[in-house]
Amino acid sequence: MTRAIMLQGTGSDVGKSVLVAGLCRLAANRGLKVRPFKPQNMSNNAAVSDDGGEIGRAQWLQSLAARVPSSVHMNPVLLKPQSDVGSQVILQGKVAGQAKGREYQALKPKLLGAVMESFGRVSAGADLVVVEGAGSPAEINLRAGDIANMGFATHANVPVVLVGDIDRGGVIASLVGTHAILPEEDRRMVAGYLINKFRGDVSLFDDGIAAVGRFTGWPCFGVVPWLKSAARLPAEDSVVLEKLARGSGKALKVAVPVLSRIANFDDLDPLAAEPEVELVFVRPGMSLPQDAGLVVIPGSKSTISDLKNFRAQGWDRDLERHVRRGGRVIGICGGYQILGTRVADPLGIEGSEREIAGLGLLSVETEMAPEKTVRNSRAWSLEHDVGLEGYEIHLGKTTGADCERAPVTIDGRPDGAMSADGRVMGTYLHGLFGSDAYRAALLKSLGIEGGGANYRQSVDSALDEIAAELEGVLDGAWLNRLLG
């Protein structure tokens, strides 16, 4: 019989995704058939699953941790926030429409059947399913029709382990408060809790564990330290762009403007891991640094809206000066579209604005269309003559004179565009920096040595390290019951 456990947080960004990945790798290392599952995710960081649909990148990473192919059923409902049209709803890997907040609340009960179907598919043949909640079950204003947290747990009869983040402070209050606010039927689902992101002497929290026990009766299944290896994993939430230091004083500065609807920003993680690269996330109100050698414009879930905001920040003028100084620019997906001369949206897919002038750094135009390209791809860099792998998730078609200088071929067809002087390029291929040979060639063209590290191997070894740390700190009796 398949066992299941669900990790829910006392709030957002408490570390659930990493813990689920760590538990999946721990179970896989013990020889179990383990699968990750998240009923509902909200993220513009999407991946293309092995069966050809869209899922959250966290679930893609968790499938890697479990050493199993990724599937659309591991994340049956994915919400991708857009601009004034609310969120795009991805159901079992395919676009199912758009919905604003209240519309989605009304839609949720209708999605439960698909969620349970996917859970059944993921569970089939598995020894263990590790489920991840979303946000917090204490948001009782969203409890009616819930499919992300306790609504799913009660319907599927999956026991819950709460995760509290001690690093942000107030973890005792968050756990006790969650106990106080949950209705009795939800409270009964909680088997215990984990403390996450602890720094220092764990014994100093002994009295805290006792206090939580007095108020709630819940057992503590472990105090998890700050997992340093997690810094080598792809980040899921854009909140990390505000927190992570990405080096300073290095040989090459790479600037990344943080678009308001930034998507798939983990494209930058392999560059951040390079010893001689300083990755600078440029937030609204800041200028693009004058000493950057490369500017990367990342993906966007709302190209027209982000293009308007790009100009409002004055980044268009900064970028023009950067190119005049001899700097390089790479646009990925939505960032590629932004670099062109025009973006048209005749059907209003992104919103009410039908057309906008682009930055004009590439002689190309983009027209949005309802058909969405979603696929994993093998590619070849025509610029550097090396192979690479990645994926495509985009709407629209881009054409123009600079497409004659396509920087890559994807599955044998030309993709992207390059300016005549070679300083500006764009492509629809996500994940290109994760290919070690391409990254090394790119960095060499920018005057530094790099790309020697195997990025994918680094991610895999980080998962093993996290699993080993969890095995050392989690309650042994609970872990043995869970893993059998």
UniProtKB/Swiss-Prot annotation:
One of its GO terms (molecular function) is catalytic activity. It comes from the Bacteria. Pathway: Cofactor biosynthesis; adenosylcobalamin biosynthesis. PROSITE patterns: GATASE_COBBQ (PS51274). Keywords: Cobalamin biosynthesis, Glutamine amidotransferase. Residues 251-438 form the GATase cobBQ-type domain. Pfam families: CbiA (PF01656), GATase_3 (PF07685). InterPro entries: Class_I_gatase-like, CobQ/CobB/MinD/ParA_Nub-bd_dom, CobQ_GATase1, CobQ_N, CobQ_synth, GATase_3, P-loop_NTPase. SUPFAM superfamilies: Class I glutamine amidotransferase-like (SSF52317), P-loop containing nucleoside triphosphate hydrolases (SSF52540). One of its GO terms (biological process) is cobalamin biosynthetic process. The active site is at C333 (nucleophile), H430. Catalyzes amidations at positions B, D, E, and G on adenosylcobyrinic A,C-diamide. NH(2) groups are provided by glutamine, and one molecule of ATP is hydrogenolyzed for each amidation. Belongs to the CobB/CobQ family. CobQ subfamily. This is Cobyric acid synthase. It comes from Sinorhizobium fredii (strain NBRC 101917 / NGR234).
